[in-house]
């Protein structure tokens, strides 16, 4: 697998530097021992103040940065909640979706649009050229850590949002070994010792409602130009490779490769016969099935993180998604449900997290 060249990442630059400040110290010289002793005696009555300052400096050095982490299955509303929170708290968002880090396929990967970002800065979103290799969990840990430092240096709160729980664990775990998959055998490999002071919010939706919503979302994505986007992306050489890397793992790419192999995009075929229609429908059905499989896998991993000791607070977005699915329901009703059952509880959780010492 090609290793990613981090010099190609726009988000990583020379401005990510760390300066270390050391306390002044006295050098020990025999000729000045008597004067040093005299100095120590003169300062003795102020020793409690000095000790207090040193203790505070030590606490400051050991204090962990606070971060907010939005978890949830694909389509559950993580991006919306992260932006909603970022407009209420001084925050910037770090993408933790391993597919959305790459340039291109904005519809297929369901990247949040510029309009929906509402001016909130987003990091590690659509910044990596897919031709430069695959971003590993270890590389994400390094890149995202630098972004956290930069955001906190601006006195803002990093909000981490995305569906790749392996990336989330890589960034947050105090002990991280890239050779092991922490989710491979229960929660025994998941680190409960975290590098940051984390506020975890899990946006959850009931299975039946989320399933119906994801089916409809795929249809809406196809209507929005996903098929045309995939036809432009199709590469007959790369699609034939046994192992897929990076953005070529995105749901939609492998599912339509078989279709485009049979009906190449460069050939203008106006007529859609029954065979071509069946091949198209099969690809769409495969996307729906694989999207649902991904959602269930993501929820299982979140439960594993919780079992490992991560203090994850759950907010239920089911009513909001039911309102979206109902044709008779107005947008106002959907927004009311979202704000009452998802946003307001999340704001309270974040406020409590930020005021904790």
Curated annotation (Swiss-Prot):
Its EC number is 2.5.1.112, 2.5.1.27. Disulfide bonds: none annotated. Expressed in the vascular stele of the roots, in the xylem precursor cell files in the root tip, in leaf axils, ovules, and immature seeds. Residues 20-39 have a biased composition (Low complexity). It comes from the Eukaryota. Gene3D superfamilies: Crystal structure of tRNA isopentenylpyrophosphate transferase (bh2366) domain (1.10.287.890), P-loop containing nucleotide triphosphate hydrolases (3.40.50.300). Residues 1-71 form a transit peptide. Keywords: ATP-binding, Chloroplast, Cytokinin biosynthesis, Nucleotide-binding, Plastid, Transferase, Transit peptide. Optimum pH is 8.0. No activity at pH 6.0. It is found in: Plastid, Chloroplast. InterPro entries: Dimethylallyltransferase (IPR039657), P-loop_NTPase (IPR027417). Pfam families: IPPT. Induction: Down-regulated by cytokinins. Involved in cytokinin biosynthesis. Catalyzes the transfer of an isopentenyl group from dimethylallyl diphosphate (DMAPP) to ATP, ADP and AMP. Adenine, adenosine, isopentenylpyrophosphate and 1-hydroxy-2-methyl-2-(E)-butenyl 4-diphosphate (HMBDP) are not used as substrates. This is Adenylate isopentenyltransferase 1, chloroplastic.
